[in-house]
Amino acid sequence: MHPNYVSWLGAVGFLLWALLCLGAWTEAYPVKPENPGEDAPAEELAKYYSALRHYINLITRQRYGKRSTPEILDTLVSELLLKETSDTLPQSRYDPSLW
């Protein structure tokens, strides 16, 4: 095989992989509801506004889990690991009688 052919094949493979990843990312994102227009009946507008409210709630929802309580974790780390007591302070080994 020629080196030029291999490099082109690698570039095409990378582009296909990037397009597949981009497609998978966009499918996971919720679809924005279609606006029925200003002259739509009241029932369709109510459905649209309900769907829009649901869409906005999905986009801006709180994320629960590890990211929701960093302050508590910071205080636990500082209290448990960084707490200075007389036991954790290094003791001097200097003994004047040895000199």
Swiss-Prot record:
Residues 1-28 form the signal peptide. The keyword Secreted applies. Keywords: Amidation, Cleavage on pair of basic residues, Hypotensive agent, Neuropeptide, Secreted, Signal. Gene3D superfamilies: 6.10.250.900. GO terms for molecular function: neuropeptide hormone activity; neuropeptide Y receptor binding. The modification Tyrosine amide is found at residue 64. It is found in: Secreted. Expressed by the venom gland. Heavily expressed in the venom gland transcriptome. One of its GO terms (biological process) is neuropeptide signaling pathway. InterPro entries: Pancreatic_hormone-like, Pancreatic_hormone-like_CS. Transmembrane segments: none annotated. GO terms for cellular component: extracellular space. Belongs to the NPY family. Neuropeptides Y are crucial for the regulation of cardiovascular processes such as blood pressure. Venom of Meiacanthus fangblennies shows a potent hypotensive bioactivity (tested on M.grammistes), but has no effect on the heart rate. Therefore, finding a neuropeptide Y sequence in M.atrodorsalis venom suggests that this protein act as a hypotensive agent. In contrast to venom of most venomous species, the venom of Meiacanthus fangblennies is relatively painless, when tested on mammals. While species-specific nociceptive effects are possible, this defensive venom is surprisingly multifunctional, being markedly hypotensive (via neuropeptide Y and/ or enkephalins), weakly neurotoxic (unknown components, possibly PLA2s), and perhaps also pro-inflammatory (PLA2s and/or enkephalins). PANTHER family: NEUROPEPTIDE Y/PANCREATIC HORMONE/PEPTIDE YY, PRO-NEUROPEPTIDE Y. This is Pro-neuropeptide Y.
